[in-house]
Design a protein with these regions (language model features):
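Structural/interface elements that position substrates and couple domains in central-metabolism enzymes
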Residues: 9-244
Length: 244
């Protein structure tokens, strides 16, 4: 029992930031808070942040409004427009901003890399920077280069890691998908990052959910592979329906 309590206390000491309060960011941040982490959701949209502070949820997901209010009241869920203000208190920063399609169909990483630049400009201690957004293979390395460039311009040497933790949430079932996952995929490139991500997902380990560690490119590819498989299944079913 004391071993279990010790692990839970370790998790309760986790402070994380989620950048982006869209569907993925808000659901993920709220669920992490529900599991006991201290979470700050960040968005540049001041009206959205003010609305969230007042209990106005900008998306519809069954049960989310109640969960947000419960965790705000408990002091585990916070909202801000100032990412730099939380960088010295958090252990992990999740990037969950939008990646709209360019004209050629490729993912536009502008917002992702803007967040990375801001992190590099404001961080003063070790952080793990994690992509939650759906991004192409190689994005983590672009984030790493962007952060390092910002640090170089400041003439400071601060250690950090990047990681990939793609989401597999279905609208309408997102809370259950997060709290009772079929699998959690985490891509890391250092033991230090792995230890922090293990601490964060410790409740999943305790409940015997599958938490799968791999290298970062494999984690990035896993999300695209899952999306492609879903699209293939839908196309196949449509073709069969046309034949029948």
């Amino acid at each position: 029992m004391s071993f279990l309590i010790g692990f839970l206390l370790i998790f309760l000491n986790m402070d994380i930031a989620i950048v982006g309060t869209g569907y993925v960011g808000l659901v993920s941040g709220t669920c992490f808070a529900e599991l006991g982490a201290n979470v700050t959701c960040v968005d540049i949209d001041a009206s959205k942040i003010n609305g969230l502070r007042e209990g106005n949820i900008p998306i519809y997901e069954p049960g989310l409004d109640t969960m947000v209010l419960r965790n705000v009241k408990a002091g585990r869920l916070h909202f801000t427009t100032d990412l730099k203000s939380v960088l010295n208190t958090v252990h992990i920063v999740f990037i969950a901003v939008g990646t709209p399609s360019d004209k050629d169909g490729s993912a536009d990483l502008q917002y992702v890399l803007e967040v990375a630049k801001t992190i590099g400009e404001g961080m003063n201690k070790y952080l793990v920077v994690v992509t939650k957004s759906t991004v192409p293979v190689g994005t983590a390395q672009k984030i790493k280069s962007t952060i390092q460039l910002a640090l170089n311009k400041r003439h400071v040497n601060i250690d950090f890691d990047v990681a990939s933790n793609p989401e597999f949430l279905k609208e309408g079932d997102a809370i259950d998908d997060f709290m009772k996952p079929d699998r959690v995929v985490i891509g890391v490139e250092s033991e230090k990052a792995r230890e922090l991500m293990t601490r964060l997902y410790n409740p999943m380990f305790l409940n015997n959910f599958r938490v799968i560690f791999m290298d970062i490119p494999s984690a990035e590819m896993t999300k695209y592979a899952a999306n492609s498989m879903l699209a293939t299944r839908i196309s196949f079913m449509n073709d069969i329906a046309n034949l029948c």
